[in-house]
A protein has these predicted regions:
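N-terminal short beta-loop-beta anion/metal-coordinating cradle
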Residues: 1-78
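Gly/Ser/Thr-rich loops at beta-strand to alpha-helix junctions
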Residues: 18-22, 80-83, 108-113, 151, ...
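Short, solvent-exposed amphipathic alpha-helical segments in soluble enzyme
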Residues: 29-33, 89-92, 186-189
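Secondary-structure boundary elements
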Residues: 38, 93-104, 162-167, 195-199
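Hydrophobic/aromatic beta-strand patches that form the interior of the parallel beta-sheet core
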Residues: 41, 72-74, 103-105, 167-172
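Internal, conserved structured core segments that host functional sites
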Residues: 86-133
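Catalytic cores of processing enzymes, dominated by hydrolases/peptidases
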Residues: 114-191, 195, 241
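A conserved C-terminal secondary-structure "cap"
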Residues: 179-243
């Protein structure tokens, strides 16, 4: 696996990959569209499905980086198969370290059984690495994720980031497990706005929620299959060592 392309030094890298409720994927796509970010790099691997993305008659790779000075985004048009989780996580963090990022913020979903009863999903944060990251979350009014498991690419990137000394934050929005959740993505982006001082408008996510659900349902279906193999439902459990 290799990443082809260069990033912007001293920039935040936002990672949003297909996961529970497609929270990360929807968030990443919305950031790119809202800020008009251009493709700067892509992932090449034989572990990826044999897919290309065609947009306005131009060909793109399915897993790619977008960016500008100060901010980069990693998004994917395809599910992250379990066999891809470790090599992708390590490669992304290694590339981020080489490019001299300021830090990595991963956006993901934390599935809850009663999501249907919650009008405004909560967003929790995990801070790893530099001590001031916890202060950043507190100042942004993001609650700490106190106990539990996190499964998937976000978990690997957080762990690898900490090992390499890269400031790492994970934002987890309450969401549906196997149903696209633009509402959860909107809340995650509002938290991101507060953390980084951005002004990403989330109103389109809420206004076009049903359109987004229809447009992403096939990606959600294929992602759900991958999540089952990764035991994503394991996140409902409490760690035995800390009970």
């Amino acid at each position: 696996m290799k990443i082809v392309g260069r990033g912007f030094k001293n920039s935040w890298l936002i990672v949003g990959l297909p996961d529970a409720g497609l929270v990360g994927a929807i968030s990443a796509a919305h950031i790119v569209k809202a800020l008009g970010l251009e493709t700067i790099a892509h992932v090449e691997s034989e572990l990826l499905p044999p897919v290309i993305v065609v947009h306005q008659s131009r060909v793109y790779d399915p897993v790619r980086f977008f960016g500008r000075e100060g901010l980069m985004v990693l998004g994917s048009e395809v599910p992250v198969h379990p066999s891809l989780v470790y090599p992708l996580g390590r490669s992304v963090v290694e590339w981020a370290a080489k490019e001299g990022v300021k830090g990595i913020i991963t956006i993901t979903g934390i599935a809850i059984p009663n999501r249907l009863d919650i009008e405004v999903p909560e967003v929790y944060g995990i801070a790893g690495g530099a001590a001031e990251l916890s202060d950043m979350l507190a100042k942004a009014n993001v609650k700490n994720f106190e106990e539990g498991f996190v499964v998937g690419p976000a978990a690997i990137m957080m762990r690898e980031g900490i090992r390499r000394g890269i400031p790492s934050i994970m934002l987890l929005a309450q969401c549906f497990l196997e149903y696209p959740d633009p509402g959860a993505a909107a809340q995650a982006l509002l938290a991101l706005n507060r953390i980084l001082g951005l002004e990403i408008d989330v109103k389109p996510l809420l206004d076009e929620a049903e359109v987004i659900r229809v447009r992403t349902r096939e990606l959600m279906r294929r992602t759900a299959e991958a999540l089952k193999q990764m035991r994503k439902a394991h996140e409902y459990e409490v760690p035995l060592m800390y009970t």
